[in-house]
Amino acid sequence: GLIFFFGKYNQEKSLKKIYSYNYAFLGAISFSKKFKQEFANMIFLELLKEKKIIYYLDNIDFYIKEDNLAIVCIPFFNIDLNSNLLKKIIKNALELNIEKIEIITISNNQKIDNKKINIETIVFYEWALI
């Protein structure tokens, strides 16, 4: 298909997220153009290659249950500026016993110290090649 819908984990009646093979299509049906949405769409297309079931959670863009992995798209991540968001992401991940969080960025590689969960920021082009 050209358009993909996926739901929130354990909430079948929740709003679905929409992704597409064609970036222009999403721009045509949206009133606002947001780089983060286009960046998340790029990440989605990479995940689609793995043919795994994808969900989303509050503050977590992609949750792959079978890998116990949360993926968050933050193009311009900065630990100091995003500390409150990171706390929310960690809280949501720990509630589901997620073992690893990957924060996909445009320019940052960084291992974040956390005793409860493995957190890593990875530059998109490196992540896409893994």
Descriptions of predicted regions:
Residues 1-68:
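Accessory nucleic acid-recognition modules appended to NTPase machines
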Residues 19, 71, 102-104, 120-122:
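Hydrophobic/aromatic beta-strand patches that form the interior of the parallel beta-sheet core
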Residues 30, 82-83, 112-114:
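Short glycine-/acidic-enriched loop or helix-start segments at secondary-structure transitions
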Residues 43, 47, 60-91, 101:
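Conserved catalytic cores of phosphodiester-cleaving nucleases, focusing on short active-site segments
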Residues 59-61, 104-111:
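Short, polar loop motifs at secondary-structure junctions
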Residues 108-130:
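Domain-level recognition of nuclease-like catalytic cores that cleave nucleotide substrates
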